[in-house]
């Protein structure tokens, strides 16, 4: 089994949808190294801080947990200010020699804002309340955008979009974890 940098990015799809006063983040459970499925029920979506922030990650698991811990520290430093906490984390991520090597991306959300954080220092907010990361991210994003105008609620859109991504992306499965917040 090989474990190269490119291979570590395969193995997940994380999607968030903000609709009808709710924000939902969902992720599949597959962890792959190369062409081998290592685990099918990993939990890549969770509540952060005091439960008022939800997040999901794609990339190297240990790196993502390190970033979640750093984000929780920033949330303690800047309570109720998710955007500020994320910008401060992104600054550290870009400038710290140790953090710069971490290979992960994150989607985080609170009742007001949804953000994608990348190792290049990007902190991005979607225009339409929908965004996705990971190997099946583009498939899930397209499906969610198509379903956003329907009568389906945010959780249904996330679940259905992740199922569609799992049907297309070999690094994504149907073991979905969902976290939600009501505005």
Curated annotation (Swiss-Prot):
GO terms for biological process: proteolysis involved in protein catabolic process. It is found in: Cytoplasm. A double ring-shaped homohexamer of HslV is capped on each side by a ring-shaped HslU homohexamer. The assembly of the HslU/HslV complex is dependent on binding of ATP. It comes from Afipia carboxidovorans (strain ATCC 49405 / DSM 1227 / KCTC 32145 / OM5). One of its GO terms (cellular component) is proteasome core complex. The keyword Protease applies. PANTHER family: ATP-DEPENDENT PROTEASE SUBUNIT HSLV (PTHR32194:SF7), METALLOPROTEASE TLDD (PTHR32194). Its EC number is 3.4.25.2. The keyword Protease applies. Belongs to the peptidase T1B family. HslV subfamily. CDD domains: protease_HslV. It comes from the Bacteria. GO terms for molecular function: metal ion binding; threonine-type endopeptidase activity. Protease subunit of a proteasome-like degradation complex believed to be a general protein degrading machinery. This is ATP-dependent protease subunit HslV. Keywords: Allosteric enzyme, Cytoplasm, Hydrolase, Metal-binding, Protease, Sodium, Threonine protease. NCBIfam families: ATP_dep_HslV, PRK05456.1.
């Amino acid at each position: 089994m090989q474990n190269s940098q490119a291979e570590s990015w395969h193995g997940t799809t994380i999607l968030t949808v903000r609709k009808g006063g709710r924000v939902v983040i969902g992720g599949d459970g597959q962890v792959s190294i190369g062409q081998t499925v290592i685990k099918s029920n990993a939990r890549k979506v969770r509540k952060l801080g005091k439960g008022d922030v939800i997040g999901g990650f794609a990339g190297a698991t240990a790196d993502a947990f390190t970033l979640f811990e750093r984000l929780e520290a920033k949330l303690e430093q800047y309570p109720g200010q998710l955007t500020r906490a994320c910008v401060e984390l992104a600054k550290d991520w870009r400038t710290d020699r140790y953090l710069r090597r971490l290979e992960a991306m994150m989607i985080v959300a609170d009742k007001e804002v949804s953000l994608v954080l990348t190792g290049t220092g990007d902190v991005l907010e979607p225009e339409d309340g929908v965004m996705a990361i990971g190997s099946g991210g583009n498939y899930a994003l397209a499906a969610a955008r198509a379903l956003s105008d329907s009568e389906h609620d945010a959780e249904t859109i996330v679940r259905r979009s992740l199922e569609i991504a799992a049907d297309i992306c070999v690094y994504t499965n149907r073991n979905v974890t969902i976290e939600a917040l009501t505005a």
